[in-house]
Amino acid sequence: MHRKAVLLEGAKMKNAQETDQWVWVVVQDPGGREQFLGQHDKLENVSYIPVFRSKEEAQQCLLNMVRRKNCKYEVQAIVFEDLAKDAAANGFMIFLLNENGEILQRIKP
């Protein structure tokens, strides 16, 4: 699952569902048993993978995400289509968030 971060800084998402679009995600335990950092919205009772338009937005929002103690986290870029396949296979939605954790778009893969 390890991906190279090749998204140009400041690139705008035209449509988060475009299959060739790169997005930024948080990866838990990179280089080991890595997996996407998922979150759970208790009000809507939905599990989701947060995605971001930029690495900086992801890094800033990571500070407020629910995380495991003593676990390493890394922001990485991934092709949206690859993420959508993994999210669908594991029962996760995808939420496009801003740096403050506000939901900009909900995507059912």
Regions from the language model: what does each represent?
Residues 2-109:
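Conserved NAD+-utilizing ADP-ribose enzyme module
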